[in-house]
């Protein structure tokens, strides 16, 4: 399957994302996504556009005050607030271009505090041409990218034994969901799981009970991936067991950007620890599944 293109635009004025033309072309006609690129959430201004039309800004104190926009203190600022979160509903904003609210936001981004960022952009609309976004931002040197796909196989991989009805595991019968989660992290990191005496990097080994798989396949897809594409992949994995297979289960793990200003839904993304936010599907050959969701230590729990 194809994962579709995404785009990189260098030095794009933030004002371009609130114009009536952009909102009508992309936000109202499909799912539009944008995320500032190469910005650190703990020290830089960061921006994300969500598919529901919400524009989320994480701004340092000086920038926030210069824009004059209304927001709220970051919940991770500590005693002295040095970061603010601004949420702008583009759907509501574009409903009346003559309103004081639209004029104020437009003035803030265009004249009072013009902000420019390097953006990752993606747009999903059934039947739409992929070149629409390329032509729209042609004046900014837009680049089209495809997600990078890497395939690898591991022979004789020791894997945890799982049973769909035993989420918490059972001694000598099945491993727990938590044990699987740790094991997946080691596999994705290409860690040596043999726990040999000479291995000083990691003493981790596969949880018990386990079984040896003659050949395990790992496919890694890296890029600005849309949820719509991930759903298609998940459906294909579910159909993997339409015919009998030797494999008892397969997994699909999705990791978000560490420096995104939002994590689950519209929750603010914490930046004081690792910045993790990810989810993992485990699909069993009997069509049962597990869904695991994780965030950093300081973030709100997923819904």
Swiss-Prot record:
One of its GO terms (cellular component) is nucleolus. GO terms for biological process: endonucleolytic cleavage in ITS1 to separate SSU-rRNA from 5.8S rRNA and LSU-rRNA from tricistronic rRNA transcript (SSU-rRNA, 5.8S rRNA, LSU-rRNA); tRNA 5'-leader removal. The keyword Nucleus applies. Keywords: Nucleus, rRNA processing, tRNA processing. It comes from the Eukaryota. One of its GO terms (molecular function) is ribonuclease P activity. Its main location: nucleus. Pfam families: Ribonuc_P_40. It is found in: Nucleus, Nucleolus. Component of ribonuclease P, a ribonucleoprotein complex that generates mature tRNA molecules by cleaving their 5'-ends. Also a component of the MRP ribonuclease complex, which cleaves pre-rRNA sequences. Component of nuclear RNase P and RNase MRP ribonucleoproteins. RNase P consists of a catalytic RNA moiety and about 10 protein subunits; POP1, POP4, POP5, POP7, RPP14, RPP21, RPP25, RPP30, RPP38 and RPP40. Within the RNase P complex, POP1, POP7 and RPP25 form the 'finger' subcomplex, POP5, RPP14, RPP40 and homodimeric RPP30 form the 'palm' subcomplex, and RPP21, POP4 and RPP38 form the 'wrist' subcomplex. All subunits of the RNase P complex interact with the catalytic RNA. Several subunits of RNase P are also part of the RNase MRP complex. PANTHER family: RIBONUCLEASE P PROTEIN SUBUNIT P40 (PTHR15396:SF1). This is Ribonuclease P protein subunit p40. It comes from Bos taurus (Bovine).
């Amino acid at each position: 399957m194809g994962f579709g293109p995404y785009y990189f635009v260098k030095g794009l004025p933030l004002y371009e994302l609130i114009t009536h033309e952009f909102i009508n072309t992309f936000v109202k006609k499909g799912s539009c996504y944008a995320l500032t690129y190469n910005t650190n959430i703990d020290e830089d201004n960061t921006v994300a556009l969500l598919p529901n039309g919400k524009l989320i800004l994480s701004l340092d104190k000086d920038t926030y005050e210069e824009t004059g926009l209304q927001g709220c203190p970051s919940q991770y600022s500590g005693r002295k607030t040095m970061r603010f979160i601004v949420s702008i509903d583009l759907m509501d904003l574009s409903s009346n271009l003559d309103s004081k609210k639209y004029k104020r936001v437009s003035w803030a981004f265009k004249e009072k505090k013009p902000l420019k960022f390097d953006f990752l952009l993606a747009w999903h609309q059934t039947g739409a041409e992929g070149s629409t976004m390329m032509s729209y931002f042609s004046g900014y040197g837009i680049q089209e990218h495809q997600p990078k796909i890497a395939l690898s196989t591991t022979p004789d991989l020791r894997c945890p034994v799982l049973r769909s009805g035993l989420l918490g595991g059972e001694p000598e019968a099945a491993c727990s969901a938590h044990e699987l989660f740790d094991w997946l992290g080691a596999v994705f990191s290409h860690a040596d799981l043999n726990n040999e005496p000479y291995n000083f990097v990691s003493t981790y080994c596969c949880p018990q009970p386990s079984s040896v798989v003659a050949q395990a396949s790992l496919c890694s897809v890296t890029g600005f991936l849309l949820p719509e594409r991930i759903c298609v992949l998940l459906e294909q994995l579910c159909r993997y067991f339409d015919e009998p297979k030797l494999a008892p289960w397969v997994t699909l793990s999705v990791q978000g950007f560490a420096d995104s200003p939002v994590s689950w839904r519209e929750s603010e993304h914490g930046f004081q620890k690792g910045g993790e936010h990810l989810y993992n599907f485990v699909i069993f050959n009997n069509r049962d599944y597990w869904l695991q969701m994780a965030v950093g230590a300081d973030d709100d729990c997923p819904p």
